[in-house]
Structure formats: structure tokens, C-alpha cells
Amino acid sequence: MKVVFLDNTDQVAQWVSGYIIWKINSFKPTISRPFLLGLPTGSSPIKTYKNLIKLYQDGQVSFKYVVIFTMDEYIGISSDDPTSYCKFLHDNFIDHIDIAQENVNFLNGNVTDLNYECERYEKKIKSYGNIHLFIGGVGKDGHVAFNEPGSSFNSRTRVKNLSRETRLSNARFFSYKIEAVPKFALTIGLATLLESQEIIIIATGQDKAAAVQAAIEGSVNHTWPISCLQFHPKTTLICDELSTVELKIKTVKYFQELEVNNNKIFN
């Protein structure tokens, strides 16, 4: 696992957006060979999306031959509801770039057969091959997408019961009314995520510090879903200063020295 320590959320967003653009442009996607990008919702990526829109407007990247898969969606909320992840991504990113709508893939939490929807999503990903780059966030309890503590590392896209802690955290998007937050959601599984060629996890804010500590210094443990990323050959955890307060000083220094040495080699 690679860990990048930055000072604040602005620097995190600049790093992540710059890396996404570099990956797309280096890949040189075409209509027959698109770049497969996994994206999250929530508060963590908002600044990253703003940066990506600005860079697109400046002509530094095109999303014409990019195919997007999202991580999760609530069950029982319509796609045009302001609290739906579909609506969120359209408002904050999709509607501002040159991507074809048929290249944007969402889970549908309003279908009659939810299990079939999960199978359909897995097959759709497989029809393209493995996702080239999956961007994600992490919850303060270590959940990734809606893979709550206790999730199997072999899990696939499925229906997931949301914990009270997750619903309390997400209540800010529902006028701070926990009773308005759905109790169930569709989510990609941890195994689905781990099949991606590369993963970047954004961790910002002191409330993510315990999860960051578990991901970097802790053992692989299903009570901290983020720890599964220790199995992945190419994962980068991007942290602001506040999210690192639970780490040992020697851990921070170790990864900072690695990053300095990497920069010397590759620059």
C-alpha cells in the first residue's frame, strides 16, 4: 500500500484529480478501448469533482471514451431525488463533462428484483474487463462503499443493511433526520473492488483517523473493511493531516521518506 500525506482537503483534491487525468490521458482511450473509472459519492470527492470539471473546461482531459461505474445506491429512493447517489453524481460531475450518458453506470435501487440488479451490475463490469482505476472514500468505521464492518472480503455486489452509525453520518444529507435515511442499499462488494487494477482511497478529517490507522497499522480484519486493501497490489491512500492523528510518528515518517525517494526516482 502506498500512502500520501498532504496538508489539507484542497491538496488532496488537487492530487487525486491530477492523477485521474494523468491516468486517462496516458491510457489514450478510444471508442473500442475505453478507460474504466470507478467513482464514489458523498462529501469526500466533491472538491475532486470540481477540479476535474475545471480541468475538463480548460481542455486538459476528455471523458468521451471513459466508462464510469459507481459504488453504491440507496434502496427505495428515485434516481432524481436530491439524496440519491445518481442525482448527486449528475449534479456534481456528470452533467458538466463530455461523457456519453450510456457510459455512466448506476445501481438501481428501485427495481423489483434487487438480486438480479446486483448480478446485472457485476456482469456489466465484467463485460468491459476489470476497472482500471477505482476512486473511493472511507467511513469513520472503516466501511468502503456500503461494505459495513463484518463484510466478507469475498463479497460481490449485493443488498446491504446499513448500520446505525452509517445512517447517523449520512443524516446530514437528509436534513439531519436519521429516520429519513434508508436502512438498505446496493453496494459493490469488497471482492468487486479488489479486482480493480488500481484503487485510490480518499481519507480526510479527524473523524477518519481511526479508519486510517486500521488501514495502515492494523491487521487485516473484517471489522475494518478498509483493511482488505492490504491485499491489493496497487492501492494508494490519500490523507490530509487531520486524518493521520492516530498514526505513530514513525509510521508517518516512514511513508513520507518513501514518497520523497519515489519522487527522486520518477522525477
From Swiss-Prot:
CDD domains: GlcN6P_deaminase. GO terms for cellular component: cytoplasm. GO terms for molecular function: glucosamine-6-phosphate deaminase activity; identical protein binding. It comes from the Bacteria. Transmembrane segments: none annotated. It is an enzyme of class 3 (hydrolase). Pfam families: Glucosamine_iso. GO terms for biological process: carbohydrate metabolic process; glucosamine catabolic process; N-acetylglucosamine catabolic process; N-acetylneuraminate catabolic process. Keywords: Carbohydrate metabolism, Hydrolase. The active site is at 72 (proton acceptor), 141 (for ring-opening step), 143 (proton acceptor), 148 (for ring-opening step). It catalyses: alpha-D-glucosamine 6-phosphate + H2O = beta-D-fructose 6-phosphate + NH4(+). Pathway: Amino-sugar metabolism; N-acetylneuraminate degradation; D-fructose 6-phosphate from N-acetylneuraminate: step 5/5. The keyword Cell division does not apply. Its EC number is 3.5.99.6. The keyword Nucleus does not apply. Signal peptide: none annotated. Catalyzes the reversible isomerization-deamination of glucosamine 6-phosphate (GlcN6P) to form fructose 6-phosphate (Fru6P) and ammonium ion. Belongs to the glucosamine/galactosamine-6-phosphate isomerase family. NagB subfamily. Homohexamer. This is Glucosamine-6-phosphate deaminase. It comes from Blochmanniella floridana.
